[in-house]
Curated annotation (Swiss-Prot):
CDD domains: PBP2_CidR. Pfam families: HTH_1 (PF00126), LysR_substrate (PF03466). InterPro entries: HTH-type_LysR_regulators (IPR050950), LysR_subst-bd (IPR005119), Tscrpt_reg_HTH_LysR (IPR000847), WH-like_DNA-bd_sf (IPR036388), WH_DNA-bd_sf (IPR036390). This is Uncharacterized HTH-type transcriptional regulator YwbI. It comes from Bacillus subtilis (strain 168).
């Protein structure tokens, strides 16, 4: 039994098909079938029930699946550590971040980092905070930028932004000249929301329900600039972070502080507590922490 046997076994179990596993791994189906058969003979057990083209794990197969995942994870961690030793200052970092902050301060941070580590490459994945947390959780991303809260049992984190949400309306809106606005005043308004895979979707929905109403959502999007454009076309209202509002055209939209309640928008960088981070990822975290982190932002209260 070797790592290749376990890799083939896990892929067949995941896809429930020898054919699909062979396509995924770019090897012939007979090769995979032979590997699995050899593994079963070596262990003296059946790992799969064969039912035509569909395969299912046996009870022994389920136990094997759990253990094989841990073995592969440990092997990958070992490989990463050895690569660090052999290839210092080289690597690839996968970062997930919400679309609304991608063009903000991160190009500057990445640019400065590249001056010191020119051989480190990056994959930037723009998505809502919920999906970013899932990506860091399942290992498809190394590091994530998310809207808090994040699961403190799973992730390390440090806070980089502490702001609140602001109301954005058309200049002709009845509230356009107000100094501040209470959330309950918006109960009859058409809302333009972020999608459900954004933390702000659930955050705003929860606060509206607490204020005594369920918001009338006419559009959902993943892009903050779409929200501002829809508001400027007088098609609805939006709630956006202060950082975004500072860049909006005051001739097209009006920004009003939202009070009672104040809805926080806190951004943090997260990474898994139980997963090995490559040299490149650790170096980027340290660089970003020195660049963006303010210890006061992580203080309680």
């Amino acid at each position: 039994m070797d790592i290749r046997h376990l890799t083939y076994f896990l892929e067949v179990a995941r896809l429930k098909s020898f054919t699909k596993a062979s396509q995924s791994l770019y090897v012939s189906q007979p090769t995979i079938s032979k590997m699995i058969k050899n593994l079963e003979e070596e262990l003296g057990i059946e790992l799969f029930y064969r039912n035509g083209r569909q395969v299912e794990l046996t009870d022994a197969g389920h136990s094997m699946y759990v253990q094989a995942q841990e073995i592969i994870k440990s092997f990958q961690n070992l490989t990463s550590e050895l690569n660090d030793i052999m290839e210092v200052k080289k690597g690839h970092v996968r970062i997930g971040l919400p679309p609304m902050i991608g063009s903000g301060f991160f190009p500057r941070v990445l640019g400065d980092f590249r001056e010191n580590y020119p051989n480190v490459t990056f994959q930037l994945v723009e998505d809502g905070s919920i999906k970013v947390q899932e990506g860091v959780g399942d290992g498809s991303l190394d590091i994530g930028v998310v809207v808090l809260p994040a699961n403190e049992d799973i992730f390390h984190s440090f806070t980089i932004v502490k702001e609140t949400l602001m109301l954005v309306v058309h200049p002709s809106h009845r509230l356009a000249d107000e100094k501040e606005c209470q959330l309950r005043e918006l109960k009859d308004e058409p809302f333009i929301f972020f999608r459900e895979d954004f933390v702000l979707h659930n955050r705003i929905m929860t606060e509206c329900i607490k204020a005594g109403f369920r918001p009338h959502i006419i559009y959902e999007t993943s892009q903050w600039d779409f929200i501002s454009e829809m508001v400027s076309a007088n098609l609805g209202i939006g709630l956006l972070p202060e950082r975004i509002c500072r860049g909006l055209d005051p001739e097209k939209v009006k920004v009003i502080p939202l009070v009672d309640p104040v809805i926080p928008w806190h951004l943090a960088i997260i990474w898994r507590k139980d997963r090995y981070l490559s040299f490149a990822a650790r170096a980027w975290l340290e660089h970003t922490k020195s660049y963006l982190w303010d210890p006061k932002k992580d203080s309680k209260g």
